[in-house]
Amino acid sequence: ERTKTGLSELDRVLGGGFVQGSLTLVGGDPGIGKSTLLLQICQKLGEQDKNILYVSGEESVQQIKIRADRLEITTEKLKLLSETNLNIIESVIAKENPDYVIIDSIQTMFIDEVSSAPGSVSQVREATSRLMHLGKGKNISLIIVGHVTKDGAIAGPKILEHMVDTVLYFEGDKQASYRILRAVKNRFGGTNEIGVFEMVHSGLREILNPSEFMLSGRPENVSGSVVTCSLEGTRPMLLEVQALVSYTTFNIPRRTATGMDFNRVVLLIAVLEKRANLQLAAYDSYVNLTGGIKIAEPSLDAAVAVAIASSYKNVAVSADTVVFGEIGLTGEIRAVSMAERRVAEAAKLGFKCCIV
């Protein structure tokens, strides 16, 4: 049985809501908004008369209460516990019998019977295993927060991601206001679905039309700017690709790529030199996917190539044009999946021409 959270962007990522007895792992950089998201989930579930136990190993009950007041969390179905000893947490769960338990975070939990320090591989593995069996046995949905390493992977043993039912990554540029929730594993739904949120003073606000949000403030009639359409899961999203091609006096030109695969950009520059006869060897090339979002889809190829050519020729691309398609080594543009859905998304926002 599924329970919709009431947050449509989160339900989209989960595949329709939380499954009873499931174990969900949420990872993300410090300060990205994981705890804020979880408290807002508590409010929505509380409105559906669900009992929630929020266990924090990093903050006191008073500190959680301060944040909950700021986020206007008013549900009386939420109970707070500041504890790191899993044996005590299990006894509280047995006494309260909640529908949902949130553990923030799994790296702070410890078990008396395991001799190593909290956060160690054995402690994290054993704590997750105990919680998994507890949730399945009592049909309690568990949500655990996991710290991430400096390269973005969830800290702890890789088996942690194998043990849980769903792995969600909460990501985004801290300098930007938006956040992206991405499912990288989901036993009860599709993967690579994304939900888009905006961080405001009162918490996270859902972005129901991310294309319009991502293109806000886009300059028109400027060379090097091209709109493309990427597909994240089943959701088409319009994004702006910017390129700057600048003459250099150095022997080796600079190449940079932000938000996309650097090697792919270098390959496209080589294709433009060989097939389109653009003399880019004496020019620095800087390519950026605006908004700080990261996309690994090959459908960006055509937009990147057009943006580079536009900047090199100093000719602006028409503001009502969308470009997407994969480029091969011989210079051909290959078809990409769900082209009709991408075109429909572009038409919805008033674009009149698609180059595919």
Please tell me what each predicted stretch does.
Residues 1-15, 19-25, 32-39, 43, ...:
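Peripheral, non-AAA+ core regions of ATP-driven protein-machinery
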Residues 52-56:
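Conserved RecA-like ASCE P-loop NTPase motor core of nucleic-acid helicases/translocases
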Residues 60:
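Conserved Rossmann-like nucleotide-cofactor binding loop
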Residues 29, 57:
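P-loop (Walker A) phosphate-binding loop of NTP-binding proteins
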